[in-house]
Regions:
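Blade-level signature of beta-propeller repeat domains, shared across WD40, Kelch, NHL, RCC1
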Residues: 139-172
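Surface-exposed loop/turn elements that mediate protein-protein interactions on large endomembrane-trafficking
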Residues: 12-22, 61-75, 115-125
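Blade-terminus and WD-like Trp-Asp/Gly-His loop motifs, strongest in beta-propeller folds
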Residues: 1, 37-47, 85-94, 144-151
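Conserved blade-ending motifs and adjacent loop-strand segments that build the rim/top face
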Residues: 27-30, 73-86, 121-145
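Loop/turn-rich, solvent-exposed surfaces of beta-rich toroidal or solenoidal domains
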Residues: 49, 58-60, 75-121
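Beta-rich catalytic cores
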Residues: 6, 34-36, 58, 81-83, ...
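Short loop/turn segments immediately following the C-termini of beta-strands
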Residues: 1-3, 51-53, 99, 157
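Structural motif
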Residues: 3-12, 56-64, 103-113, 160-168
Length: 172
């Protein structure tokens, strides 16, 4: 955990090699790349978000690698990436705490979104408004799927105090 603008953020230790104190880069970052909000999927993959500076703009991606660092796939998002994401049980759907539909979509940060991956692109659908203030770490939505993938659970301080909310993923 820490800042995303570091030379190398994601590391792994392979205990099978017998060198438990030797950390190696899991995903080698290049100049102009940053990654953050790493998580293990229920399928055993590692999901994360990446920003890549390209032709004067920043492109946001959802990415997946194996625990040995083998690159699996990446998906370009249509606008700013969500702050936090999680995958459903079979990695076919991602829940995110913003739903930007275009690079200039300023309202998107107030929405929970469902993201499907098709042909190298993230297809964003807004699920519901969370309207959190983002003032504290506790007020960040940090969305997750319920074990049966039917519900999206998230936090918000929209009512004046942080509460946990549920939205029916099957409603859209």
């Amino acid at each position: 955990e820490g800042g995303s603008n570091v030379l190398q953020r994601m590391w792994i230790v392979d205990f099978a090699k017998g060198l438990p104190r030797l950390a190696e880069p899991l995903f080698r970052q290049h100049f102009g790349e940053s990654c953050c909000h790493e998580y293990f999927t229920r399928c055993g993959e590692i999901g994360f978000q990446a920003n890549v500076r390209h032709e004067g703009r920043v492109e946001g991606y959802n990415c997946f690698v194996r625990t040995d660092g083998t690159w699996l796939r990446q998906f370009l998002l249509p606008g700013a990436r969500p702050g936090h994401i999680q995958s459903n049980s079979d990695n076919t759907l991602i829940i995110g705490d913003s739903g930007c539909l275009a690079p200039d979509d300023s309202e998107g940060r107030a929405f929970m979104s469902l993201i499907r991956h098709e042909n190298g692109r993230g297809i964003v659908t807004r699920l519901c408004r969370h309207d959190t203030s983002w003032k504290t770490q506790v007020s960040h939505p940090h969305p997750i799927f319920s074990p049966d993938d039917r519900w999206a659970l998230y936090a918000s301080d929209a009512g004046g105090a942080c509460n946990v909310y549920m939205a029916d993923v099957t409603s859209i």
